[in-house]
Every structure is written in C-alpha cells, then in structure tokens.
Amino acid sequence: MGFILFEILSLALLVALFSATGRLVEWAVSRGHSAFQPAFVTRQALGMAVWVAAAFCLAASGLLARWLVFVLAGVMVLAYLVAAVRGRAALEMPSRRDVGLEGLGTAIAASSMGLLLWALFLQTIWPAVGWDANVYHLTVPRLWAEAGGFRPIAFNVYSNWPLNTELLFLVASLLRDYVLAKLIHYWLGVLTLIAVFWIVRRSAGALYGWFAAALVLCNQIVLAEFRVAYVDLAFGFFFFAAFLLLQAALERERRGPRDLIVVGLLSGVMAGI
C-alpha cells in the first residue's frame, strides 16, 4: 500500500511541476490576453515542452545530473510562486461543472471512468516493462543518465537521435525511477481523454463527453499502451492539443501571432516524439 501511495504522490508532484512550468510559459506568451483553452491540458503540454528542452540542453552539454534536475525543478516552482503572489500566474481550481458532475448520469459515467483509470494505474506501476521500452524507450534514457549526457550506444539503431518522449522519461527517471517514467505515458493518455471530454462537453454536454472518452479507451491499442512506456500516446496527445488550440484560434474574430505560437510549439514537440 505504501508503494502505491508513493507512486500517486510522485505522479501528483510531477503533474504539479508541469502545471507550474506551463503556467509560466502561458503567462509569458499570452500576457494581456485570455488563457489558452483547455487551460489545464495546455499548461501540461507547455510544461512538458519546457522540460523536454531542459533535458536536451543538459544532456547535450554533458551536465545531466540528478541534483541539477532537482535544482531546476525548484527554480521553476519558486518562479511560479513569485508570479502567483504577484497575481500573474495563479492556477484556477476546477469546479464540479468543469469535470461534468452535474447529474446522476454524469456522476455514474465519471465514476466508471475513474475506476477504469485506477485499474490501469495499478497495472502501470507494476515493476515490469514492455519489449520496446526494455530495448530503447527506457534503456536509452537510463544510459544517458549514467553517462551524464548523450553518448553513442552500439548496436542500438533507435538511439541515433533523442525522442522528445524519451527525454521526458529521462527527467522522470532522474527525479524518481523508471516506474515514474511509465506513469508519464499513462498520464499522457489521461490528458488525451481530458481533451476529448472537454471538446465534446463544450458542444454536446458532459454525459456525451464522458461517452466520447470511453470510446477512445475502446481502442485496444490505446488501452494497451496506457500501461507501458512507449511514445504513441504522446504523439496523439500533442497532436490533439495542437489541433484544439488551432481550432480555438481560427474561431476568434481577432487573431494575432500569439494565438499560433503555442500551436507551433506543440506541433514541434509532436514532430520530435
């Protein structure tokens, strides 16, 4: 039980770190403008993008170390707290309406989805890895961490260039271990479901939003990949997040370069998955 609680806490802290980092980027990009929607999904994506870039810079310069990653995390959190105190980057707490708990039907649908995601969470934290993860998705970041940066890996054709998702796995491995890296891929799947729920709820209602999210999980490939440290759910998440932001930008009567900066950023992250 202690192991499960610790993994929940580890993932929650990592999610909070991504949110704080993403909120800082959002404030810098959209200063004086309304927040990008869906806000939570966008901030998670932006936070991940920043940490992908940070991991790449550290590894490329040979400065990759656990203590330095913790220092950077502390700096990000401190910068966010300063911005929040000044009223520039406060995080809004979701309401019952945001998660679609307005009636009995939606509450039952949300509870069912929660139970399924809980079961997938328990399977994800099981200390076992998939074939591809064992060959390169987790092994390559582990070798980078041991070497303090990028290094040639003989006979491994998948290590010729760092994938963005593997850089996220690298950050998670340095902050905790490979189980947290597996949970990142799980969390990317959850974020995709949140994005699907958000767009459908906005046009058809909360109950249909939960139904749409459930339909995504009916795909056996998606269901299987929740539990392993692969990269496919990351590709789907960043693609869909960029699409939602592009759609929102096109719906505005007045559009400017700021509206497309985040779209381009997330598309770039997706291209490097």
Task: List the model feature ranges, each with a label.
Residues V77-V85, L180-S203, A241:
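Transmembrane-helix motifs of polytopic, lipid-linked glycan transferases
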Residues Y80-A83, A107-W131, C218:
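Transmembrane signal-anchor helices characteristic of membrane glycosylation enzymes that use polyprenol
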Residues W198, A242-L260:
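Membrane-interface transmembrane helices that cradle and orient dolichyl/undecaprenyl
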Residues A212-A213, D259-I273:
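Membrane-interface alpha helices of multi-pass inner-membrane proteins
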